[in-house]
UniProtKB/Swiss-Prot annotation:
It comes from Dictyostelium discoideum. It is found in: Membrane. Keywords: Membrane, Transmembrane, Transmembrane helix. One of its GO terms (cellular component) is membrane. The lineage of its organism: Eukaryota, Amoebozoa, Evosea, Eumycetozoa, Dictyostelia. This is Uncharacterized transmembrane protein DDB_G0283513. It is a single-pass membrane protein. The chain crosses the membrane at residues 34-51.
């Protein structure tokens, strides 16, 4: 069970990295770091919630 939750967390984090890197490409053109941080928070926080929800199942 622990291994399964670790697997899901690692897959979620790899998805987050892909989303954040695509966001950073767009925001680096406008050089807006706060927008990047906001976007990263929007992506990471639900991902962590989903990972903990999966871990409890």
């Amino acid at each position: 069970m622990l291994f399964k939750s670790l697997q899901s967390i690692s897959s979620v984090s790899s998805i987050q990295k892909n989303q954040i890197s695509s966001v950073s490409v767009g925001s680096s053109q406008s050089n807006n770091n706060t927008a990047l941080l906001d976007a990263a928070a929007v992506v990471v926080v639900p991902g962590l919630l989903a990972a903990t929800a999966v871990a409890h199942i």
